[in-house]
Amino acid sequence: MALPSNFLLGVCCFAWLCFLSSLSSQASTEESQSGASENVESEADPWSLLLPVDGTDRSGLLPPLFKVLSDRRGETPKLQPDSRALYYMKKLYKTYATKEGVPKPSRSHLYNTVRLFSPCAQQEQAPSNQVTGPLPMVDLLFNLDRVTAMEHLLKSVLLYTLNNSASSSSTVTCMCDLVVKEAMSSGRAPPRAPYSFTLKKHRWIEIDVTSLLQPLVTSSERSIHLSVNFTCTKDQVPEDGVFSMPLSVPPSLILYLNDTSTQAYHSWQSLQSTWRPLQHPGQAGVAARPVKEEAIEVERSPRRRRGQKAIRSEAKGPLLTASFNLSEYFKQFLFPQNECELHDFRLSFSQLKWDNWIVAPHRYNPRYCKGDCPRAVRHRYGSPVHTMVQNIIYEKLDPSVPRPSCVPGKYSPLSVLTIEPDGSIAYKEYEDMIATRCTCR
């Protein structure tokens, strides 16, 4: 009886070992498959590295620009804007921002968002519906779904693009009749405004329609229906001189908006810190110019330290006295070799597979802070007193308390020109996108 019992025990042990080995192989296979899928997903969606495991941003920790683009998942916009409209917005971008995407401090406008919409529908009416002139009116329908509730209209412009054949040295007086379809039932006469310009010097015609569209945009109207008649008279010639403007494409609608959300950059809040005179009262011959405080603190501080070091070395000469060595010893506590400072990190939006959306800038340098924080940090880094207290606690009382970390202390905004999913073009200024100063906290 002992032999069969031992045999049964051996069979059970062998079966149990086989079961455990199959479980371990299955777990390793699933782990490798999940790791491979995670690698594929991270390659396909670079922003997935910024999200939790389930891919949702519950805490709202994503930077505003990254959050906007992460919702699009790298898809190509379904509609592409007209090339002339895109060219106009690129020129606008160069006027407002530098090549690196930083908003120019010389600008004085209050809007931080500009949206260009192309008409989603265009229909030419019959001649019986004309308001004035020999040309029929053109119906234009603009879809404003991309305008958010936090974006307030400051100015609206109807943009016409002129053909190259329209160049002329003659003075042309243009009359434009605009009718908002929703307002025709009230029986009011269509607004009319004269514009005088020389075609040779203009590629675009901008017609201010703020007074017409302000009530509609304020009331969150998502669809604007306009009827437009655009005729011009050359050299003030009477009726036989009236001709049609050679327009290459239907007009676009441009909205200049003030985005009041927290993710947008509000330039009027930093005007005092951006501009300041360099001369004191009573001084003459010194011109006032814009001064960027962040640039001064970031760029001049290292140079000043290097200059002071050179002066001290020249004064001391080749003699290495004990006092000089002692000063060098104490200086390593105040200015460590691997001190906390800004570092560049230049990347291209094509590396993140966001170049389908972002037209400008092509490259982005967010910069980052790296290095050791010295013991005396308040004067140089603008750190609070708490940082010094934390340093003392770490050194004297409890080493488990972390030392102050080298982190960004100030940021600058980033101007971005993007193509929206509906084919519209948007210029936006995002807050806190480029580190400009480091601090220890």
UniProtKB/Swiss-Prot annotation:
It comes from the Eukaryota. Keywords: Cleavage on pair of basic residues, Cytokine, Disulfide bond, Glycoprotein, Growth factor, Phosphoprotein, Secreted, Signal. Gene3D superfamilies: Cystine-knot cytokines (2.10.90.10). Ovary. Strongly expressed in germinal vesicle (GV) stage oocytes, MII-stage oocytes and in zygotes. Residues 1-29 form the signal peptide. CDD domains: TGF_beta_GDF9 (cd19403). GO terms for cellular component: cytoplasm; extracellular space. One of its GO terms (molecular function) is growth factor activity. It is found in: Secreted. Belongs to the TGF-beta family. Ovarian physiology and fertility are controlled by endocrine and paracrine signals. These act in a species-dependent manner and determine the ovulation quota in different mammalian species. While humans, and mammals such as the cow or red deer, normally ovulate only one egg per cycle, other mammals such as mouse and pig can ovulate in excess of ten per cycle. The mechanisms that regulate the species-specific differences in the number of follicles that go onto ovulate during each reproductive cycle are poorly understood. Required for ovarian folliculogenesis. This is Growth/differentiation factor 9.
